[in-house]
Amino acid sequence: MSEEKQTAEQVEAAEQEEVTEQAEQAASQEQHEETAGQEEALQHQIDELQGLLDEKENKLLRVQADFENYKRRSRLEMEAAQKYRSQNVVTEILPALDNFERALQVEAESEQTKSLLQGMEMVRRQLMDALEKEGVEAIEAVGQEFDPNLHQAVMQVEDENFGSNIVIEELQKGYKLKDRVIRPSMVKVNQ
């Protein structure tokens, strides 16, 4: 019996050992599953945070691009304002310049009138020099092809001496300030 008892004890010890191993394996598996669950939760949290980070980076890039565009637009507007700062003054002076040119077309009959016209021509020349320093230039019209960006056609005639769509006569001078037309030339155009 002692052998039976010993065998029974061995069987019981083996069973006890097996139960302990199974319990340890179950605990280990639970711990592994718990760790895997935590890893999965952490990975999910990392993915969410990465998505938020990407979204914020995109917003930042858009804001930076918008700001750069704003700076560029502002700079261009400032340059244009500086470039064309004298446009209002020039526009106001042009009618006086037109009157000078009309007055200079009068034929002088006396020495006194000739002297007066010479003085007026000098004043007109000084005005033109000052305007040219600001970037004002007269638009060439007579003999040029009609350009609606530079010329305003007020009359059309048929003249065999000129080609089609050629400016025959300038009725009022046009002017440009740098590259901007501030007053188109009023012209007579051949059909």
Curated annotation (Swiss-Prot):
GO terms for molecular function: adenyl-nucleotide exchange factor activity; protein homodimerization activity; protein-folding chaperone binding; unfolded protein binding. One of its GO terms (cellular component) is cytoplasm. GO terms for biological process: protein folding. Residues 30-49 have a biased composition (Basic and acidic residues). Gene3D superfamilies: 3.90.20.20, Head domain of nucleotide exchange factor GrpE. PROSITE patterns: GRPE. The keyword Metal-binding does not apply. Belongs to the GrpE family. NCBIfam families: PRK14140.1. Participates actively in the response to hyperosmotic and heat shock by preventing the aggregation of stress-denatured proteins, in association with DnaK and GrpE. It is the nucleotide exchange factor for DnaK and may function as a thermosensor. Unfolded proteins bind initially to DnaJ; upon interaction with the DnaJ-bound protein, DnaK hydrolyzes its bound ATP, resulting in the formation of a stable complex. GrpE releases ADP from DnaK; ATP binding to DnaK triggers the release of the substrate protein, thus completing the reaction cycle. This is Protein GrpE. It comes from Bacillus velezensis (strain DSM 23117 / BGSC 10A6 / LMG 26770 / FZB42) (Bacillus amyloliquefaciens subsp. plantarum). The lineage of its organism: Bacteria, Bacillati, Bacillota, Bacilli, Bacillales. The gene is grpE.
